[in-house]
């Protein structure tokens, strides 16, 4: 019996000071309260960032829609401005009463902002225009190529040199003379002398009874 008691006492030896300290620290640690990390501030920041980003996306989209609408309006305005109005169409043609032009006289009318010469030619002028040698012309054209009715010569009153307006019934050939640089045109409006390279231009026109419609 004594031997057994001795063995038991041997098994339960007193704890050392170091062991007691470790156990005490473990108990204190187990009793201490660990704080759970608070993510509210982070979540709030993320939510604020998401809201800001969503607002930015909304503004970009809205500006895109406004830009598209503005571009569409601009295109529609541009196209509508290109559509010819009644006034513009009226200016595209000009009607002249030929009965009001005396024989051997010129009139000047305005067509699309350009002067148009209309000459009521005499029989002598018609004969003179047809008697010209083509080899003597800088820009060869017969009179028949330049008129629809021999007694009516209709052409643009713009010098083919630099765009000045020639003077009627003047020059060395009894037709038109450009005072800017000295070009002379005959009674058919053909260049005969001076720096102009071409004859006076013939516009599109048609006769309608006693009237002519230019354009």
Swiss-Prot record:
<keyword id="KW-0249">Electron transport</keyword>
<keyword id="KW-0001">2Fe-2S</keyword>
<dbReference type="GO" id="GO:0046872">
    <property type="term" value="F:metal ion binding"/>
</dbReference>
<keyword id="KW-0809">Transit peptide</keyword>
<comment type="subunit">
    <text>Component of the ubiquinol-cytochrome c oxidoreductase (cytochrome b-c1 complex, complex III, CIII), a multisubunit enzyme composed of 10 subunits. The complex is composed of 3 respiratory subunits cytochrome b (COB), cytochrome c1 (CYT1) and Rieske protein (RIP1), 2 core protein subunits COR1 and QCR2, and 5 low-molecular weight protein subunits QCR6, QCR7, QCR8, QCR9 and QCR10.</text>
</comment>
<feature type="propeptide" description="Removed in mature form">
    <location>
        <begin position="23"/>
        <end position="30"/>
    </location>
</feature>
<protein>
    <recommendedName>
        <fullName>Cytochrome b-c1 complex subunit Rieske, mitochondrial</fullName>
        <ecNumber>7.1.1.8</ecNumber>
    </recommendedName>
</protein>
<dbReference type="InterPro" id="IPR004192">
    <property type="entry name" value="Rieske_TM"/>
</dbReference>
<dbReference type="GO" id="GO:0045333">
    <property type="term" value="P:cellular respiration"/>
</dbReference>
<keyword id="KW-0408">Iron</keyword>
<dbReference type="InterPro" id="IPR014349">
    <property type="entry name" value="Rieske_Fe-S_prot"/>
</dbReference>
<keyword id="KW-0411">Iron-sulfur</keyword>
<feature type="binding site">
    <location>
        <position position="178"/>
    </location>
    <ligand>
        <name>[2Fe-2S] cluster</name>
    </ligand>
</feature>
<comment type="similarity">
    <text>Belongs to the Rieske iron-sulfur protein family.</text>
</comment>
<dbReference type="GO" id="GO:0045275">
    <property type="term" value="C:respiratory chain complex III"/>
</dbReference>
<feature type="transit peptide" description="Mitochondrion">
    <location>
        <begin position="1"/>
        <end position="22"/>
    </location>
</feature>
<keyword id="KW-0679">Respiratory chain</keyword>
<feature type="region of interest" description="Hinge">
    <location>
        <begin position="90"/>
        <end position="93"/>
    </location>
</feature>
<keyword id="KW-0813">Transport</keyword>
<dbReference type="InterPro" id="IPR036922">
    <property type="entry name" value="Rieske_2Fe-2S_sf"/>
</dbReference>
<dbReference type="Pfam" id="PF02921">
    <property type="entry name" value="UCR_TM"/>
</dbReference>
<dbReference type="GO" id="GO:0005739">
    <property type="term" value="C:mitochondrion"/>
</dbReference>
<dbReference type="InterPro" id="IPR005805">
    <property type="entry name" value="Rieske_Fe-S_prot_C"/>
</dbReference>
<keyword id="KW-0812">Transmembrane</keyword>
<feature type="domain" description="Rieske">
    <location>
        <begin position="123"/>
        <end position="214"/>
    </location>
</feature>
<feature type="topological domain" description="Mitochondrial intermembrane">
    <location>
        <begin position="81"/>
        <end position="215"/>
    </location>
</feature>
<dbReference type="InterPro" id="IPR017941">
    <property type="entry name" value="Rieske_2Fe-2S"/>
</dbReference>
<comment type="function">
    <text>Component of the ubiquinol-cytochrome c oxidoreductase, a multisubunit transmembrane complex that is part of the mitochondrial electron transport chain which drives oxidative phosphorylation.</text>
</comment>
<keyword id="KW-0496">Mitochondrion</keyword>
<keyword id="KW-0479">Metal-binding</keyword>
<dbReference type="GO" id="GO:0016491">
    <property type="term" value="F:oxidoreductase activity"/>
</dbReference>
<keyword id="KW-1278">Translocase</keyword>
<feature type="transmembrane region" description="Helical">
    <location>
        <begin position="51"/>
        <end position="80"/>
    </location>
</feature>
<keyword id="KW-0999">Mitochondrion inner membrane</keyword>
<dbReference type="InterPro" id="IPR006317">
    <property type="entry name" value="Ubiquinol_cyt_c_Rdtase_Fe-S-su"/>
</dbReference>
<dbReference type="Pfam" id="PF00355">
    <property type="entry name" value="Rieske"/>
</dbReference>
<dbReference type="GO" id="GO:0005743">
    <property type="term" value="C:mitochondrial inner membrane"/>
</dbReference>
<keyword id="KW-1133">Transmembrane helix</keyword>
<feature type="disulfide bond">
    <location>
        <begin position="164"/>
        <end position="180"/>
    </location>
</feature>
<keyword id="KW-1015">Disulfide bond</keyword>
<feature type="binding site">
    <location>
        <position position="161"/>
    </location>
    <ligand>
        <name>[2Fe-2S] cluster</name>
    </ligand>
</feature>
<dbReference type="GO" id="GO:0008121">
    <property type="term" value="F:ubiquinol-cytochrome-c reductase activity"/>
</dbReference>
């Amino acid at each position: 019996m004594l031997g057994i008691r001795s063995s038991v006492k041997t098994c339960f030896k007193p704890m050392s000071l170091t062991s007691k300290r470790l156990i005490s620290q473990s108990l204190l640690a187990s009793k201490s309260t660990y704080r759970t990390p608070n993510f509210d501030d982070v979540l709030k920041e993320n939510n604020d960032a998401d809201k800001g980003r969503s607002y930015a996306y909304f503004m970009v989209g809205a500006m895109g829609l406004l830009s598209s609408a503005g571009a569409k309006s601009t295109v529609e305005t541009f196209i509508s401005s290109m559509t010819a109005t009644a006034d513009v169409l009226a200016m595209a043609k000009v009607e002249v009463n030929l009965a009001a032009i005396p024989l051997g006289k010129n009139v000047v009318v305005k067509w699309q902002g350009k002067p148009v010469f209309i000459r009521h030619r005499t029989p002598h002028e018609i004969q003179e225009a047809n008697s010209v040698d083509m080899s003597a012309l800088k820009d060869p054209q017969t009179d028949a190529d330049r008129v629809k009715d021999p007694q009516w010569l209709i052409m643009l009153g713009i010098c083919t040199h630099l765009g000045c307006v020639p003077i009627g019934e003047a020059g060395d050939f009894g037709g038109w003379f450009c005072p800017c640089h000295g070009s002379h045109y005959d009674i058919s409006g053909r260049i005969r002398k001076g720096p102009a390279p071409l004859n006076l231009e013939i516009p599109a026109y048609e006769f309608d009874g006693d009237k002519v419609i230019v354009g």
